[in-house]
Every structure is written in structure tokens, then in C-alpha cells.
Amino acid sequence: MLSTDLHIHTSCSKDGESSVQQVLSAAIAAGLDAIAITDHDTMQGYKIARELDTSVLVIPGVEISTREGHVIALGIETAPNHGQPVLDTIKMVQDKG
């Protein structure tokens, strides 16, 4: 079984404070095997993390702002447009695989 945190924000997100490197260091210190960086409406934190040498599996993800609230999308490589109706956003995520 993997010890995983699937909802982490970095300073690439409007509400995150820790750099990507700080997040990865904290994940290692906490004994996590995997994390998903799910910054708001951007995948920049994930893109930075995938370039770093780390023992933590970094799952691609994003927290998408919709008209009705937020949706977490995992396993996609590009973020869909934000600010859309939630059902349209879910469809866009499904279409990305």
C-alpha cells in the first residue's frame, strides 16, 4: 500500500505558501510514497516537480475552479479551462483521459 496525499498546493497556486522543493521535502519527511500537486487552475507546480530528482511519486493533478465550485482532476497533463460549468469541466477532464 502507498502512503499518499492527493491534494497539495504549492506557491504556484494562489493559496499555497511552500515551494515545490519544500513540498517534496515535507512529503519525504512525512514518509509519503506519492503526492498529487493540485494547485488552483495551473499545473506549473507539477511541471516543476517532475523535473526534480525525488523519491516521491508525483501524480499530475490540478484543482479546477468551476462556476459551481472546485473539481480535483488527477492523471492529466494539461489543465482544462477554468470558470466553466462543473459538468462541462468534468467532461473536459474525461476527454483528456
Briefly describe each language-model feature range:
Residues 1-68, 87:
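An N-terminally biased module of ancient metal coordination in phosphate/nucleic-acid-related enzymes
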Residues 22-25, 77-80, 91-94:
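Short, low-complexity, polar/charged sequence segments that are solvent-exposed and flexible
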Residues 31, 96-97:
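Glycine-centered loop/turn motif at secondary-structure junctions
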Residues 48, 83-96:
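Histidine/acidic residue-rich metal-binding segments in metalloenzymes
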Residues 59, 72-83:
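Glycine/small-residue-rich loop that forms an oxyanion/phosphate-binding "nest" at active or ligand-binding sites
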